[in-house]
């Protein structure tokens, strides 16, 4: 699992990287990190994601995001698993 650096957080905030919440839409709607977009792991549709940008993925505890990281990497995306929601909220300064 990767821990975001301050520069990586800035890249997300300024739109140079994606923060992708791979939980279900209901889970996402119950609370998510700022700047996150929701692409549920169950229907991983990446058509609107620019392959030239880094993708940081998270879920509830890191399990689904680990699987998504692997899948995206196999498809040529630059993806990193950053763990669970509370890890992300802490790193983003939202905890």
Predicted feature locations:
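Rhodanese-like catalytic fold shared by cysteine-dependent sulfurtransferases
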Residues: 2-8, 12-18, 25-54, 63-95
């Amino acid at each position: 699992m990767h821990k975001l650096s301050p520069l990586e957080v800035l890249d997300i905030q300024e739109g140079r990287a994606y923060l992708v919440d791979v939980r279900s839409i209901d889970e996402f709607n119950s609370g998510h990190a700022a700047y996150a977009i929701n692409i549920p792991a169950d229907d991983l549709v990446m058509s609107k994601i620019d392959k030239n940008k880094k993708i940081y993925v998270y879920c509830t505890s890191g399990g689904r995001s680990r699987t998504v990281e692997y899948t995206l990497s196999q498809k040529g995306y630059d993806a990193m698993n950053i763990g669970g929601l509370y890890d992300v909220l802490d790193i983003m300064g939202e905890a």
